[in-house]
């Protein structure tokens, strides 16, 4: 269970970002996570795009090709109602994981 929670951290970060920003392209998601974490977290694009594809296949996000402000085509991602439910579940699971880690750190 904890291993899945740790591996699901990227999903949680992406879903939370899309819940706050409505829609973003992949690089925008990377930048938002970096800025929102005060540069403590960074997401490699090589990890992000497979995760976005998997989340889209799961129905948690949907995508649409659009033209950016710099006149380039980019795939923009948006949270779905199923993604909102998954976000709520992932937040609860993550809080439980953090609670467990805190308990161990206090014990040690």
What are these regions (language model features)?
Residues 1-4, 65-66:
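Short beta-strand/turn micro-motifs at beta-sheet edges
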């Amino acid at each position: 269970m904890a291993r899945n929670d740790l591996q699901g951290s990227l999903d949680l970060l992406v879903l939370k970002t899309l819940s706050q920003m409505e829609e973003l392209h992949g690089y925008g998601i990377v930048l938002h996570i970096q800025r929102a974490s005060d540069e403590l977290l960074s997401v490699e694009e090589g990890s992000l795009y497979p995760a976005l594809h998997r989340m889209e296949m799961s129905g948690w996000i949907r995508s649409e090709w659009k033209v950016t402000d710099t006149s380039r085509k980019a795939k923009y991602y948006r949270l779905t109602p199923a993604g909102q439910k998954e976000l709520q579940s992932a937040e609860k699971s993550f809080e439980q994981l953090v609670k467990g880690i805190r308990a161990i750190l206090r014990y040690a």
